[in-house]
Amino acid sequence: LLAGTLFETRRTAVKAMTCAGFFKTAERARVSIRNTKAGNFLPPGTNALIAFDFVNHGRSAAFLEGARFTPYVAKFLPEVPPLSDRAGAFQWVLSAGETKGYLEPLGLTEEQFKAWQVEKANIFVLGCVIYRDVFGQKHQEDFAVMFMPRGGENGMDTFRPVMMREYWRSRSGSEVEAL
């Protein structure tokens, strides 16, 4: 009788832990970017403003801790895109369903400009946003955006952004990189 009761208690505990895990997954924050725009990266050394909207698609608040943005010029992205050590640290709360705009100044080096101009390489901005959910779990969303020149006037729409979905990835817990 005692063994049966212990077995039932253990099974009930396992079910409760499983339900709690599903609840955390369903209710947690999920942050991504959208509405990306870039100013003019030219001439080299000029800081273009990159505009991103951070969006919380989840069902609870996200506590944004920072982001990393890396300009990268090449014909193709490597399998594992490199992220710079340069990080923007900030403390924001992003409510469920909320969108918040962010501007980051990024520029091309002489070498990157030459690769773009001579080798017809592409301009990418690689990045990640790091945040915590209401359960205290740390998350990181990696992304890559390719900017194609439109020509014409200077301004926020000089380069057309193309989201590189195959480079987007989500990480949690110990997989999250330090800022």
Where are each of the predicted segments found?
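Short aromatic-acidic-glycine turn motif
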Residues: 71-83, 153-156
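Intrinsically disordered, low-complexity Pro/Gly/Ser/Thr-rich segments with frequent PxxP/GP/PP motifs
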Residues: 80-112
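Short, cysteine-centered beta-strand-loop-beta hairpins and adjacent loop/turn segments enriched
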Residues: 57-60, 72-77, 132-139
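Membrane-proximal alpha-helical anchors
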Residues: 1-70, 127-128, 170-179
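Solvent-exposed loop and beta-edge segments used for protein-protein assembly and interaction
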Residues: 42-46, 96, 117-123
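Intrinsic-disorder/low-complexity, polar/charged segments enriched in Ser/Thr/Lys/Arg/Asp/Glu/Gln
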Residues: 47-51, 99-101, 122-124, 140-142
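Terminal connector regions
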Residues: 109-151
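Acidic, serine/threonine- and proline-rich intrinsically disordered appendage/tail regions
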Residues: 140-179
